[in-house]
Amino acid sequence: MIQTTVLHPKHLEAGAKMVDFHGWEMPINYGSQLEEHHQVRTDAGMFDVSHMTIVDLTGERVKAFLQHLLANDVAKLTVFGKALYSGMLTPEGGVIDDLITYYLGETFYRLVVNSATREKDLAWIRHHAQDFGVTVTERPELAMIAVQGSNAKAKAAKVFSAEQNAAVEGMKPFFGVQAGELFIATTGYTGEDGYEIVVPQEQACDLWQALLDNGVAPCGLGARDTLRLEAGMNLYGQDMDETVSPLAANMAWTIAWEPSDRQFIGRAALEAQKAAGSQPKLVGLVMEEKGVLRSGMPVTFTTAAGEEREGVITSGSFSPTLGYSIALARVPRDIGEQASVEIRKKLVTVKVTKPAFVRNGQKLV
């Protein structure tokens, strides 16, 4: 049985093209994926992300629990509302999921995890929470709308109450605050400014309509994917999964090695991988010739020593902002500044870059 979010009627009203996204009927676009992409880069767009899973954790030992569960360290969160991004790993060091954790009280944290991984995530979290006496509460009664773009905050301000505007004033990136009925966070998946707004389901359609009335354009999953790829943000299931180490997924920055006695799940495996130095890495690829880089395409190059090497594209697409094709690729660590990709039986040269292409409207390549 396919699931729908509470905003489903709003999508149909706007003429959205709906697709099955991991068991959810979601809008892929509202007419033009390209226009929706540019809308976010130049103005403001909004996404229904109510399919994401919100999990609240409470208990006296919740901090110690999360220090065990996550590769990043929640001890870094010293101010209420601050958030961090982390991988949740298997004992072998593979990525079960990537998620955001909000520090909302001494005994209260909130996680936002991916929808496609909901069941395994909840089972894993609940299993390990038992040892710490932590209560795990999924919040399916909450919807979520991401408002993203250079003008997103200004347009959202017209919809917020005076109390809500006061609560978010001057809020830095990666913070969240409960303001009235809304939980408003300065997070996103586009590389632009904006908010992710958690709202009770019964108020979600009214909030969506108010944002629409104030010039925020609805955007589908198609634009969400090209925006996150331009920003160099990983997509779980494509750029990493349980077979992939965070060291091979441009997630090394999310591993808190200190304090050295914090025994998080997967630590021993990661330490061995790090010592061996043999993990591949995730890089960016840019192709200015015609054609589109796609997930699964092999990437080949010759090392300085003349040895042939091969990697694979994990995510690829035409970049609407740059006007040519870009990709993320997992490749051996000794890759140089150029590589080759086979497109229509022809080897095409691609430039190897850092895995981020556009952030805050600025081209990085």
Swiss-Prot record:
Catalytic activity: N(6)-[(R)-S(8)-aminomethyldihydrolipoyl]-L-lysyl-[protein] + (6S)-5,6,7,8-tetrahydrofolate = N(6)-[(R)-dihydrolipoyl]-L-lysyl-[protein] + (6R)-5,10-methylene-5,6,7,8-tetrahydrofolate + NH4(+)
Disulphide bond pairs: none
Gene3D superfamilies, sorted: Aminomethyltransferase beta-barrel domains, Aminomethyltransferase fragment, Probable tRNA modification gtpase trme, domain 1
GO molecular-function term, one example from the UniProt record: transaminase activity
Record key words, sorted: Aminotransferase, Transferase
GO biological process annotation, one example: glycine decarboxylation via glycine cleavage system
Assigned EC number: 2.1.2.10
GO cellular component: cytosol; glycine cleavage complex
Pfam families registered for this protein in UniProt: GCV_T, GCV_T_C
Superkingdom in the source lineage: Bacteria
Coiled-coil intervals, chain numbering: none
Assigned protein family: Belongs to the GcvT family.
NCBIfam families associated with the record: gcvT (TIGR00528), PRK00389.1 (NF001567)
Described function: The glycine cleavage system catalyzes the degradation of glycine.
PANTHER family: AMINOMETHYLTRANSFERASE, AMINOMETHYLTRANSFERASE, MITOCHONDRIAL
HAMAP family: GcvT
Quaternary structure (record): The glycine cleavage system is composed of four proteins: P, T, L and H.
Protein name: Aminomethyltransferase
